[in-house]
Amino acid sequence: MKTGPKFKICRRLGDRVFGKCQTTKFTISGTEKKRKTSKHPKGQPSEYGLQLLEKQKAKYTYGTTEKQFRNYVDKVKKVKGSNHSVDLYKELESRADNVVFRMGIASTRSLARQLVSHGHILINGKKTRVPSAKIKIKDVIKIRPESRNKAVFKDLTEKAK
């Protein structure tokens, strides 16, 4: 996953792309930028421009690179007679880092990616360090016993109570 100017990307693509985009600081800075007017206002985006923005939004939201995203799209296109956009989101939602985020173990997708890549998460009893690992429906996801006393997971036990 590429690091870079998160606020600039959030302003361009809209909110809810990164965890930082959901803070009050971002909403305040966004309203200040909207007040400024330009001498040359931007025109209506083309169909291609809208598709590019949607692709970039999905790519940044799920923390994939261009190549990974392209591979997911190619994999989905091979399946005949299905809704490709729904299948693409199913593929992205079944990634290990996204499942850890959806379970509430991590507060953001980037933190979930870090927890998986540092080996704090067990999938079916095996330590997995690949954030893009595909999770199936009956897979068991646990926190590694040696990692349970970390500060990240202490908050989790308080939330669960």
PLM region spans:
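Beta-rich strand-turn-strand
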Residues: 106-109
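Short, well-ordered loop/turn sites that connect or cap secondary structure elements
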Residues: 115-116, 135
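Ferredoxin-like alpha/beta domains used as RNA- or RNAP-binding modules
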Residues: 1-103, 130-161
